[in-house]
Amino acid sequence: MSSNFKFPKVSVLIPCFNSETFLSECLTSLQKQTLQEIEFICINDGSMDSTQLIIEKFHKLDNRFILINKNNSGYGDSLNLGLDTAKGEFIGIVEPDDFVEPDMFALLYEMAVQYNLDVARCSYFYHSKYGDTEQKWPSVPKNVVVNPIECISVFKQGPSVWANLYKNSWLQRNKLRFLTTPGASYQDTSFTFKAYFCARKFMMTDHCLLHYRIDNEKSSVHDKKKIYCVIDEWNEIYNFVFSKQIQDIPLIEKLAELQHRTYLWNLGRLDHEGKKKFIKEWHLEAKYRRRTKRTHLLKLSLLHFIIEGMILYCPNVLMLYNKELAIVRILKKLAN
């Protein structure tokens, strides 16, 4: 297929690093999009497998696929390069081990244009060899325009940048970019927070349009060595929020709770030694924020104080629990 448009309606960024296992399935699903005015920017981050050859094959058949080769510098740097390259009115991101429904970008684009959205979002499936499970985040309003700052449930979703469609001009105006720490993971955490913080018009559809693969052993979420990446992301979030000098919005009151949701999730995926290392760093961070009064603007919840107290005084108890829900259940009992 040959593109006959100068400026695409949507640019889709596909950050790739040693992605050969599922990449063809991913790119095939993109090629089948019902939206024709679309470009697919594949950023090859120094892959050492057949990733580049697979992308080149798709490019020969369909010049809407664009290959960018670069030395390995990480996920965030790859996506920033994609953002700088994209010509589309809106920008989407698809991970190379996921795949999408044929009408995903047509539906999100139509929704974004109709309601003049900064961010349009879809529900999605958790995908594994056993099948698909719908993930619709019931606490988030569907098919209605909201301001995320006035609807905190938007922030409580997983980062999942790949379920969103972003207005390109809005991204550029707000100078939204990913952290570029080489070798890091979860660099969508701070980006997603900043995007929702800056957005004034957000809408989520209840249509599940993307299949998020949860059983890829190569996924960074399973990398036990990347213990502290979420801390770097949350340092970026705190720096961003305090730079805005905003003190009177509900989100500020919830900031610590949102942080601890992320930390508890990270704790749950680590092995025993990783838990000990992470809790120690969490402890040091809590002491730093108290000492420097970086949390003086936050009306911290009781749950926050309980969690912080456990980190300070009884981390061994916290290490017994691997799942966020189990931890929260225990803490609520202690609070009563």
Regions found by a protein language model. Give the residues of each.
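Membrane-interface aromatic/basic loop that binds lipid-linked glycans or pyrophosphate carriers
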Residues: 2, 272-336
